[in-house]
Amino acid sequence: MSHLAELVASAKAAISQASDVAALDNVRVEYLGKKGHLTLQMTTLRELPPEERPAAGAVINEAKEQVQQALNARKAELESAALNARLAAETIDVSLPGRRIENGGLHPVTRTIDRIESFFGELGFTVATGPEIEDDYHNFDALNIPGHHPARADHDTFWFDTTRLLRTQTSGVQIRTMKAQQPPIRIIAPGRVYRNDYDQTHTPMFHQMEGLIVDTNISFTNLKGTLHDFLRNFFEEDLQIRFRPSYFPFTEPSAEVDVMGKNGKWLEVLGCGMVHPNVLRNVGIDPEVYSGFAFGMGMERLTMLRYGVTDLRLFFENDLRFLKQFK
């Protein structure tokens, strides 16, 4: 554990030397990120005898907590110093006339959701909603992701207990809809979802929209045509679009969709596929009679691509200087 103490000391030294919040965030990633020095210490537990692992794990968690507390304290110091500097530099001219009250505007993510709902509404899709506190059946099992399935490891899930959780995707709405009605089904399901991740491109809460069609004679060609029309409508350009083979437990075949960016590079925008027969069976729909396709996309990511925003966290900081750009 001496090596652990050295890591904590090294982290605290780096924290104290961080000159701004961006540098401090780099330190956080270096030590507490998914591949951070302290996070990787948890992988060493498998080398210990079983009876020693709980105590060793507690020591590692205590070390991580020390570093997190130091990060929080330093962040507060930096933010306070920045505020004091700004206040010292600002002056107020009391002779200026009062400012008029400005009209508000829609949040950029709300604009994106409204735009997508409008497009799919014209295609006959209806908006479906479901609970944000979900059970593991609707969030995983019914979507062909049983308890032993390795795909569960891809979700950093907020669990309340062994069966209740904050939903990691809006796919549960599709399951509830298919259980409640027989085909034809044509829905989109926008909503908040939750995953335990926070950095420049991830937040613990974000918005997702999934779409579902189930009917007779639905093919991958229908899926491609629908998404081609949607993406060109959303970005208001005749985009180059490609479908790459991928894997999702609840669709087969599966694909990820990319668009060509202005820099000449492909950008991933959404995932999709034909509804897996097991999913249809789970909700009492005969896959020999019906087929369907599904797609899912992150609202913040599409908003970032549409408006050229580089940091997802800006959408949640309520900075009017940023939000006014979208009025």
From Swiss-Prot:
Location in or out of the cell: Cytoplasm
> Which cofactors are reported in the record for this sequence?
Mg(2+)
Q: Which domain of life is it from?
A: Bacteria
List the SUPFAM superfamilies hit by this protein, alphabetically. Answer: Class II aaRS and biotin synthetases, tRNA-binding arm
GO BP annotation list: phenylalanyl-tRNA aminoacylation
> Which InterPro entries did the record assign?
aa-tRNA-synth_II, aa-tRNA-synth_II/BPL/LPL, Phe-tRNA-synth_IIc_asu, Phe-tRNA_ligase_II_N, Phe_tRNA_ligase_alpha1_bac, Phenylalanyl-tRNA_Synthase, tRNA-bd_arm
What GO cellular component term, any one, is given?
cytoplasm
Q: Which principal EC class is assigned to this enzyme?
A: ligase
Q: Plastid: is it a keyword of this entry?
A: no
Question: Which residues hold Mg(2+)?
Answer: E252
The annotation note on the cofactor reads: Binds 2 magnesium ions per tetramer.
Q: Which GO terms describe its molecular function?
A: ATP binding; magnesium ion binding; phenylalanine-tRNA ligase activity; tRNA binding
Identify the EC number(s).
Answer: 6.1.1.20
Q: Which reaction does it catalyse?
A: tRNA(Phe) + L-phenylalanine + ATP = L-phenylalanyl-tRNA(Phe) + AMP + diphosphate + H(+)
Keyword annotations for this protein, in alphabetical order, are:
Aminoacyl-tRNA synthetase, ATP-binding, Cytoplasm, Ligase, Magnesium, Metal-binding, Nucleotide-binding, Protein biosynthesis
The family database entries (Pfam families) matched by this protein are listed as: Phe_tRNA-synt_N, tRNA-synt_2d
Q: Keyword ATP-binding on this protein?
A: yes
What does the subunit comment say?
A: Tetramer of two alpha and two beta subunits.
Family to which the UniProt record says this protein belongs: Belongs to the class-II aminoacyl-tRNA synthetase family. Phe-tRNA synthetase alpha subunit type 1 subfamily.
Q: What is this protein called?
A: Phenylalanine--tRNA ligase alpha subunit
Q: Whose protein is this, by species? A: Shigella boydii serotype 18 (strain CDC 3083-94 / BS512)
High-level lineage: Bacteria, Pseudomonadati, Pseudomonadota, Gammaproteobacteria, Enterobacterales
Q: Which gene holds the coding sequence for this protein?
A: pheS
